[in-house]
């Protein structure tokens, strides 16, 4: 039984993402379900202070979680997030073309499905999508520590939020320069979370820009090249941009900008909370004291153990279900 629980507890986020997707498709008041779920999550996490015991381990020290199952779930989140964006773009298109707001079907004889969407419910759909697209970034983060196929999935997942640069910046900058002035993802004391949002995003992008500039120069290759991973990362976002522009023109672009803004804010808010104000003398070893940890049950299960930052930075190659 404990082995089953060690695996299914991490299905909390995927389950709520699917509920949010269903809400955007159904329309009406259900378009706001992602916003409602966020509110419920904050309340539950505030009240439920019980500490999570990670995935628990067998007597031989191995984790009870199944690597195959957990990896499959992470890989499957990419098409789910693509569907979430498609559903929102479809809602934008219906709004822009004046599709009448009528009940055209019911699910399970109880849940109405609307053909069109009102401006108020479209706002709900945009906010809900942005909130749970941010959860996609969590899976992109986990897979960025892998190689090969998993890393490609990570880049594509982050590309859906216009942040494919993160995969390289996180591994080659944040994990090496943690809590120092050279790490844009570490917020120094006195910086607001809103200021950190922009400075961290742009700083990480600048790191990959410079990294590729130096790498390609050593290779004798032009910066404007298909071999430029900084450029390729942003090109991954082109299909998403094209989708929303075709769906609603500049309104579609505003919708996408809002979704990207929310999802990336969630990422940088996590960076802010995990390392705010911590200082490490450059070239000194990274220690557990250079991270703020949180292992309450809801945070651990919903954010797939991202709160176990100390162990994550100590053993960066370790999968989330193995962290202590």
List PLM regions with ranges.
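Cytosolic/stromal cytosol-facing helical appendages immediately following the last transmembrane segment
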Residues: 2-16, 20, 148-228, 262-324
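Alpha-helical bilayer-embedded segments of polytopic membrane proteins, i.e.
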Residues: 2-49, 65-91, 104-132, 226-268
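Juxtamembrane membrane-interface segments at transmembrane alpha-helix termini
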Residues: 43-55, 137-138, 164-167, 266-275
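Membrane-helix interface linkers and caps
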Residues: 48-62, 99-100
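Generic signal for short, ordered secondary-structure residues
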Residues: 58, 122, 152-153, 249, ...
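Alpha-helical transmembrane segments with an aromatic anchor "belt"
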Residues: 58-68, 284-288
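Intramembrane catalytic core of multi-pass membrane enzymes that act on lipidic substrates
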Residues: 62-201
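Short alpha-helical catalytic segment bearing the HExxH-like zincin motif
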Residues: 134-139, 256, 301, 305, ...
